[in-house]
Design a protein with these regions (language model features):
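Short, charged, intrinsically disordered terminal tails
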Residues: 1-4
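Compact, glycine-rich, soluble single-domain proteins
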Residues: 6-99
Length: 122
């Protein structure tokens, strides 16, 4: 059994990662699924969640963690391909901006609720 498997993570706009992985773990509609080299053929729908992979970089193993949206994962004995609507590395998350956007979303939701109450009375 090989120690790694070629792994590609793709969104509609870019190839987010392409390289060798020792392990790929994704959240499927049936639960978490881990893929190792020489895995039996497998196709799964993915739910939003955290995709984790132990990837090889410069001879070392690094943990790759990304927040992903819906998509699909195909595992073959010689490769793993993940197609998702969006993938974001945790290191790329701007926490202050995310909090600001969440607060803005809460305000919009509250405004919508108030407008609905005025129009319908409940």
């Amino acid at each position: 059994m090989a120690n790694t498997i070629p792994f590609k993570l793709i969104t509609p706009t870019q190839v987010v990662f392409e390289g060798d992985a020792e392990l790929v773990i994704a959240v499927t509609t049936e639960g978490e699924e881990g893929i190792l080299p020489s895995h039996a053929p497998f196709l799964a729908a993915l739910k939003p969640g955290v995709l984790r992979a132990n990837v090889r970089k410069d001879g070392n193993v690094e943990r790759l963690e990304l927040a992903t949206r819906e998509g699909f994962m195909q595992a073959l004995p010689d490769r793993v391909t993940v197609l998702v609507d969006e993938a974001l590395r945790f290191d790329d998350v701007d926490v202050a901006k995310a909090r600001e956007e969440a607060a803005s979303s809460d305000r919009v939701t509250a405004d919508f609720g108030a407008a609905k109450l005025r129009l319908t009375g409940h």
